[in-house]
């Protein structure tokens, strides 16, 4: 496994980009407005964001969406289970705005914006290797657990968040409950063993994706405005033709929040250079290989959209090798972003399995 699951990377020197207080205040007000209007039946008291300071890279914090903070602070968390959900690349916890209200009331739900993404701190970190890059995100999840005094929790993750979630569970199995849920995870299959993570893309989508990923790998870090406002936006939109059932009002506020993510200081978008092989989204360290080397003593539940462009083949192949020990669900008539597109079906699977 390259050793990184059992070694601690040296923390980089302390430096964080300053964030404009006025921009931060405006962003947080928009988030509160959205939660108040569109996360019914939850209220702002029940579901809200909080900046959680973590002991990493100086004065860093994770901007974290929490349902049930009052229970979290009570002894034994008021006998409730804890679920931490990790978002994917260039996203934020808001991808779960429809899912959170549908999760069983048995759970306290915690959804951090990953370090360097969303409205979390923007540290200046120079990525140098795949191991070090993965470790940055995994260690920040662990720092969050420590700060919130959580002894054990269930972990879920969407897309790249699923990749980090599983690696976290392999590195810190003592803190993770016996079930892990991965939402359309990236980085599963080893293409040398069969399967292709672009199998479900149309020809036009493949051309666009290859072009976009190729450009991302050649642009310099100084071209932040180009990569953020055009290249990354184009990649996210062209990944698939999802038909989100979002109202115009919801979309307007979400669009404003998204644009504010791009107005924040430089983020950690360059992590993909060390996680994926150029130019296609094939992992440098496939989870298929990592799991084969060290089979987690956990039940893993995989959930994909029927038209998902993530590699379902690696999951099927892995499951066959391990005697079909993992659960595997396909949500019909949706793509990669089913937490927005087919949230009722996804919530049902989660509630039945955890």
Task: Name each region found by the language model.
Residues 64, 96, 103, 109, ...:
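Generic structural signal for small/hydrophobic residues in well-ordered secondary structure
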Residues 162-174, 180:
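Short glycine-enriched nucleophile-adjacent loop
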